[in-house]
Amino acid sequence: MSELLFRLNFLLLLLLSCVSLASSFFSFNDPVVGLGACGPHQIQAFTQFKNEFDTHACNHSDSLNGVWCDNSTGAVMKLRLRACLSGTLKSNSSLFQFHQLRHLYLSYNNFTPSSIPSEFGMLNKLEVLFMSTGGFLGQVPSSFSNLSMLSALLLHHNELTGSLSFVRNLRKLTILDVSHNHFSGTLNPNSSLFELHNLAYLDLGSNNFTSSSLPYEFGNLNKLELLDVSSNSFFGQVPPTISNLTQLTELYLPLNDFTGSLPLVQNLTKLSILHLSDNHFSGTIPSSLFTMPFLSYLDLGGNNLSGSIEVPNSSLSSRLENLNLGENHFEGKIIEPISKLINLKELHLSFLNTSYPINLKLFSSLKYLLLLDLSGGWISQASLSLDSYIPSTLEALLLKHCNISVFPNILKTLPNLEFIALSTNKISGKIPEWLWSLPRLSSVFIEENLFTGFEGSSEILVNSSVRILNLLSNNLEGALPHLPLSVNYFSARNNRYGGDIPLSICSRRSLVFLDLSYNNFTGPIPPCPSNFLILNLRKNNLEGSIPDTYYADAPLRSLDVGYNRLTGKLPRSLLNCSALQFLSVDHNGIKDTFPFSLKALPKLQVLILHSNNFYGPLSPPNQGSLGFPELRILEIAGNKFTGSLPPDFFENWKASSLTMNEDQGLYMVYNKVVYGTYYFTSLEAIDLQYKGLSMEQNRVLSSSATIDFSGNRLEGEIPESIGLLKALIALNLSNNAFTGHIPLSLANLKKIESLDLSSNQLSGTIPNGIGTLSFLAYMNVSHNQLNGEIPQGTQITGQPKSSFEGNAGLCGLPLQESCFGTNAPPAQHPKEEEEEEEEEEQVLNWKGVGIGYGVGVLLGLAIAQLIASYKPEWLVFLFQSRNH
């Protein structure tokens, strides 16, 4: 069973135990579900509480949601409203009138991002509090220390910051999960955390904790059964006191910077999961690890382990089912000893850099093997032939980056195969016809090879069972074959396909992700764009207009039709796509006015209209300011927009006004199908005038924002309200007709890296505040009517003089015109200037400008259906693996 399933089952058992122990009061006054047993004041308070929120998302048939009251006193004892509420949880909420409340479940609600009200401290009889995935941010209020009766506290998957000082006095806690937040700081030996001696489940994973070593005091929490400190910044050696935790069944330390030998865990005889991947552990693997009595999951991948692998003969009785030794530096023969672990179901040996070819026959003893990952290895070509042998039980085989040049016929012998990854090899010719007849084949990743086509007719894929098919970056040409009837996810990005996109695409009702970008397709866009969550047709030769067929609540999240030959207007029915987040129609011939109506789309974050024939004003007539609630990237360069921008133009751009610390932002990559540490990614791309160069960018930190209005006919003053957009990293207003002064408020853009105001009619001086912008790497104010001395500051004086030329009244470095009547010395040696410009180019790609979202959100329904048919033993693990 995979790590994730282990954890879910373990947490469920603990919660049941917690509820049982924490709810002894039920024994004399059993709570009654529904409002019938509730007192009138409690009914009124509950009604008021629900009225504070939008409850349309509530599943009223969910028997687990509801309110429970004490049959004797009428007091609300338990309240469970999971995935039910939308709105703001305010400090004066009626919730805080339930002073007898013992159990409160508010996870997975759509709360407006805000801090946790300190009034929770008034509910001092709480024993169970679940507030995970609720959008909470900021520090946990100190009033939480009043909740001394708490036995279970779940705050995971929020945006919480600060330290764990709020756990002071919570000495009855048995379950504490604060994972996937932004808690930070050093865990000192005197931390309140180490006073929680009843803890059985402690998850600190995916935060920003740090320490020169894991505190020895963890060894004092000797009731722990699960400990997770993964994805933090711990470094140094794991203390020997970890061996005191003799009740541990699961230990997770991956994705830190631990060094030294592997931790001493031989005493932890109850251990079933040991996850130590992606650290800097060195030395050899103790052979005793392979004979621990209950250990079923061992992940040591991505370390600096070396030496030989020794598996005792007694390991034949080992319970080890999941083993990851990939990305280490072992020596000698490693497959032979591993073949003794006959109960293995999942084996990951990727990127071991063996000095000899791996013969697949060596795995013949592993009769229960479901998943085998040999990516990055040197595979014996002979062992890939039909005459070789590999366990027929295999459901997943990964042979990426293996320098394979011939399609492995051994796949014919695997009737249970569901997942095959042959990515980034050198396989040429046609994809064999027999592959599509494998009865259970569901996911095929053969991107980045040299395939030219398919054996068989254009109908060869239609009746296959494949749901995910990735053909990215091959040499496929001709007409696109008809896709499988069952397909959910298809990418043929970056090939040579041509002709019309077949209309049969529209009949594939389960197809939610389609990427045909970077090909040579001609003709119209198929008339069914509403069918998709993600549709990417970028850089083809498509003609006609974008179909205006988006029905109400169409599921579309991302539409990219940039770099085609499209004409007509932007579809008005796009307003029906309430889930739309990314829209790019750049580099076409669309002739239309600015789509003011799109500001009604609540989730739109990226809007790219670059290089079309859009025209008219940017100020919405009689509609107030141009406010987009979530917009972060607006790229309208190279059009014919006219008019001026009113002073309040940027006032209601809420998302661009917010700023986060960089470690709080998430790189969000569009179109990602996650198979644990294995990803298939198709990035949304945009072209941006960024730091003086035109380039294609693929990613953006989701907490950043960019604006490009260059190459239009805009006039008037630049609004001072631009200074409200504190998340801006790039602003390009060049090649317009702006007049007046450079706004003083630009000094408020503390995150700005690229500022281009060139080729306008700006006058006055350059504000001194711009010289204080410490992240400003590129600045261009050339060809205006500026005067006075150029502000001095590292970020400005380091710019090339071309950034200030064409302003007759400017003086001072880096120009040679002195402000004191004599020529200024050269700003820098020409060679140094060239080196600086070269260095500037090298840093351009440190942070891309584009946006995307994991398909864990975008393709949840489609992939959930897919997962439901898979055996979780290997598939769920794949959701935990590393990206190669």
Swiss-Prot record:
Q: Which residue positions does the secretion signal occupy?
A: 1-24
Please report the record's description of how this protein sits within the membrane.
Single-pass type I membrane protein
Q: Which Gene3D superfamilies match?
A: Ribonuclease Inhibitor
Q: SUPFAM superfamilies recorded for this chain?
A: L domain-like
Q: Would the keyword Membrane be found if you checked this record's keyword annotation?
A: yes
Entry keyword set? Cell membrane, Glycoprotein, Leucine-rich repeat, Membrane, Receptor, Repeat, Signal, Transmembrane, Transmembrane helix
**Glycosylated where?**
59, 71, 92, 146, 190, 208, 244, 267, 304, 313, 353, 403, 463, 520, 576, 732, 780
Which spans are transmembrane here?
848-868
Where it mainly occurs, coarsely classed, is membrane
- State whether keyword Secreted applies: no
Coiled coil ranges (UniProt) are none
Provide Extracellular-side residue ranges: 25-847
Q: Where in the cell is it found?
A: Cell membrane
Q: Which SMART domains match?
A: LRR_TYP
Q: Where are the LRR repeats?
A: 98-122, 124-146, 147-170, 171-196, 197-223, 225-245, 246-268, 269-292, 294-318, 320-344, 345-365, 366-391, 392-413, 414-438, 440-463, 464-487, 488-507, 508-529, 530-553, 554-577, 579-601, 602-625, 628-652, 702-725, 726-749, 750-773, 775-798
Q: What InterPro entries does the database record attribute to this sequence?
A: Leu-rich_rpt (IPR001611), Leu-rich_rpt_typical-subtyp (IPR003591), LRR_dom_sf (IPR032675), RLP23-like (IPR046956)
- Topological domain (Cytoplasmic) residues are 869-884
Q: Which GO terms describe its cellular component?
A: plasma membrane
Q: Which Pfam families match?
A: LRR_1, LRR_6
Similarity field? Belongs to the RLP family.
Its name, as the record gives it, is Receptor-like protein 39
Q: Which organism is it from?
A: Arabidopsis thaliana
List the taxonomic lineage.
Eukaryota, Viridiplantae, Streptophyta, Embryophyta, Tracheophyta
